[in-house]
Amino acid sequence: MTISFIIPIFNSELYLKKCVESIFNSSLSEIDIEVFLVDDSSTDDSVKVAKELSQQYNSIEVIEQNNQSNRGASVARNLGLKEATGDYIWFMDSDDYLDSTLVGQIIGDIKKYNCPDIFAIQLKLIDGKITRIECSQPNVKHNIVLKGRDAILSGYQPSSVCAIICKREFLDNNKLRFYEGISHEDVEFSMRAVALAHSVYFSDYLAYIYTMHAGSVSKSRTAERQYFYIIGDMYVALSLQKFVKTIDDVELQNHILRWSNNILLNLSLSVKRSNNPLMDKNFKKKVFLDMKNHGVFPLKGPFTSWKIWLLSKLVNLSCIHL
């Protein structure tokens, strides 16, 4: 079994080597690994580091984009998917790393459970002195193969794409690719992938170490960048509402539709309540105007509960004159 690791790189010269070596320090043979380092117009020495690593490990391919501006992780991941030939795809971020001691066990379990479409792991987030577990999916049954729709109906919450190891054939057969040009593309991709999966397995492996650095996207925002980050939720909801029209499962359709409407409500609340100096009155007006122009404000529902429905009405009344 071969694994394709797809790693977008953007100004990560300080962390890339640790990320890559966490793969090769595992028990996997190098012939069972291919690593795609996809540069996204880095302005530091990330490409130099990537090329040095490719000289050290024959299974690394460095992909450089012929553009002058940062296009985002979605574009880089889609480029990696075009080149990948492995049986499974494992997405990583270039400033994160794996617990090398667990990688071989994970691949062993993928084989043991008849190669499910998706094998999910958990993430350890390290932010300074704070450490917490993410993507644990407490509402979903673990250590048993499920249908994707059953995982969603039981309470699956899409999050980082680094938490789902996907069969390449499954991704290709369903034409699953990342929505380019938005934030929160992981959430949008993960929900569609799990919804379409015939078999998913949620493990207890805490194998992926997600680190927050001073240069992380979420910590280095201008007003323009903040707007891009915030409005991404709207595009995620719109995409999922379009997606549900393509599936025949009515119960699953309704669940995802309600869940996407909850995203829009949370977006509205976060903007309305924000004291962030970047999000002034004009910023907030722009968000709600954008939502209105896309037909999702005032909020309409359906929602996941009557309490949330009632809250949406209050939000509509309080925000409509912003």
Ranges and model annotations:
Residues 2-4, 22, 34, 188:
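Cell-envelope/extracellular polymer assembly enzymes that use nucleotide-activated donors
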Residues 32-41, 61-66, 94:
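Short beta-strand/loop segment that forms part of the nucleotide-sugar
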Residues 74, 94-201, 211-227:
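Donor-binding/catalytic cores of nucleotide-activated saccharide
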Residues 89:
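Short aromatic/hydrophobic "clamp" motif used to bind/position activated sugar donors
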Residues 271-322:
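Membrane-interface aromatic/basic loop that binds lipid-linked glycans or pyrophosphate carriers
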